[in-house]
């Protein structure tokens, strides 16, 4: 989920693949019977302690890790509503940080995947699709 405030983007610093400390947007998996938008809101709260609302889809991204795992990411645009500084963060999350696009680009190999910067660039380019893009049957 892309949350932008005053030109800075909300990211998490997290452990991935053991000891590697990387940066990523708040992200995660669906719970049973959960919509994609609801999962984005829940995961952002759990990983950053920020309540957010989502208002658009930025895109759907398909990426294959060099190890062979394939990921499909749905990226949302949202708004920060309220911070809960005393809330513990999910296991593996070290901290939530606000960084400018230029600072994020300098992280290079410390980004969890190329999708991190691509989602931000698509957001900055104005790509937005309605939440109704997804149909739930």
Could you say what each language-model-derived stretch is?
Residues 25-57, 76:
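The catalytic Nudix box helix
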Residues 12, 33, 107:
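Residues that scaffold the ATP/ADP-binding catalytic core of kinase and kinase-like folds
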Residues 62-85, 97, 119-126:
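Active-site-adjacent beta-strand/loop module that shapes the phosphate/pyrophosphate-binding cleft
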Residues 18-23, 91-137:
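Nudix hydrolase/Nudix homology domain
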Residues 4-9, 17-19, 31-32, 77-84:
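Short, charged/polar surface micro-motifs in flexible loops or helix N-caps
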Residues 13-14, 42-46, 97:
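Short, cationic motifs built from Arg/Lys/His that form the positively charged side of catalytic pockets
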Residues 1-25, 52-56:
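N-terminal strand-loop-strand
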